[in-house]
């Protein structure tokens, strides 16, 4: 009726079955625990399959003076999942609906069927998602950011106008402020990158806090784990970290400092300082040619 009163649910294989209203049971029931505990004891198995049908609780409720109602939904909102195949079908439906909602809200998906989202993914208007991007749980992306191909993001908060990827990995408790950049083959975990800070290539940033307008050179590693405990690094504003550097935590690098390429830094760096930690270069004039000639003679001897 208009109040959607429910008096019985009849299984398809029962003699009384006669589908005239176009409705079928989704298998989802909601009941007060006290009433459920009472009525479930009264269920009998006097049916064609000699089974105990939980759905009989509706008829029992009506018999004992309780009222039941039903809620209608689309079939694909409550499809059954009893196998991996059915799970895949349900997941595809969820992903398709989620993609459509994102695009309707102003998010650009360049190849929608290749992008995968979690139930709680939030992406704001103006964002561009390139092909083959995966969002784990707990991701929020503010407006006008770009996520490039083959990136994997989970548990991360991304500000406005950020650039991620391609081939980037953002792990839980990562927070990127506006206009930050995380480039190809960069992994970030439990770290904060302030406004306009960038790590464009081949780096690992773990358990760290980076100030504004700081540059992390290619191949930089934040060494955060001593085999037992994780340690944190704090890098100030306007810091330049040269390529192939190792920053050994716990560590603080002050504002405006420079870390020379190839350095292994394990002591705090004061503000506006140059930190350099690598062997002194020596040039042996003419020795390179002598070594090459010697190696060539050895190679010729082996060939004979």
Where are the model-predicted features located?
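Catalytic cores of nucleotide-enabled group-transfer and carboxylate-activating enzymes in metabolic
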Residues: 27, 39-40, 58, 149, ...
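Conserved core of the sugar-phosphate nucleotidyltransferase
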Residues: 1-48, 55
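Glycine/small-residue-rich pyrophosphate-binding loop that anchors the diphosphate of NDP-sugar donors
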Residues: 25-32, 119, 231, 249
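Residues that scaffold the ATP/ADP-binding catalytic core of kinase and kinase-like folds
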Residues: 9, 39, 81, 90, ...
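A short, conserved alpha-helix in the catalytic core of glycosyltransferases
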Residues: 50-65
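Extended, small-residue-rich solenoid/repeat segments and analogous flexible loops
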Residues: 62-166
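Glycine-rich hexapeptide-repeat left-handed beta-helix
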Residues: 163-304
């Amino acid at each position: 009726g208009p109040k959607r009163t429910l008096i019985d649910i009849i299984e398809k294989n029962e003699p009384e079955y006669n589908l005239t209203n176009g409705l079928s049971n989704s298998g989802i029931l909601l009941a007060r625990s006290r009433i459920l505990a009472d009525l479930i004891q009264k269920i009998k198995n006097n049916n064609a399959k000699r089974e105990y049908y939980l759905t009989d609780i509706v008829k029992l409720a009506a018999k004992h003076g309780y009222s039941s109602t039903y809620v209608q939904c689309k079939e694909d909102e409550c499809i059954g999942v009893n196998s991996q195949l059915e799970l895949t079908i349900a997941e595809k439906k969820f992903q398709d609906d989620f993609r459509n909602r994102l695009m309707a809200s102003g998010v650009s998906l360049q190849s929608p069927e290749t992008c995968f989202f979690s139930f709680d993914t939030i992406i704001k208007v103006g964002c561009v998602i390139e092909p083959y991007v995966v969002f784990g749980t707990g991701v929020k992306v503010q407006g006008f950011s770009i996520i490039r191909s083959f990136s994997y993001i989970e548990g991360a908060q991304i500000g406005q106008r950020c650039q991620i990827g391609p081939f980037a990995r953002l792990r839980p408790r990562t927070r990127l402020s506006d206009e930050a950049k995380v480039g190809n083959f960069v992994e970030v975990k439990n770290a904060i990158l302030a406004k306009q800070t960038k790590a464009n290539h081949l780096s690992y940033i773990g358990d760290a806090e980076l100030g504004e307008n700081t540059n992390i050179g290619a191949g930089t590693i934040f060494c955060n784990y001593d085999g037992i405990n994780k340690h944190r690094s704090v890098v100030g504003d306007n810091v330049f970290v040269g390529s192939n550097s190792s920053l050994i935590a716990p560590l603080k690098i002050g504002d405006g400092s420079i870390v020379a390429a190839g350095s292994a830094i394990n002591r705090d760096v004061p503000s506006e300082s140059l930190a350099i930690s690598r062997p002194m270069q020596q040039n042996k004039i003419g020795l390179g040619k002598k070594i090459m000639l010697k190696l060539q003679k050895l190679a010729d001897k082996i060939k004979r």
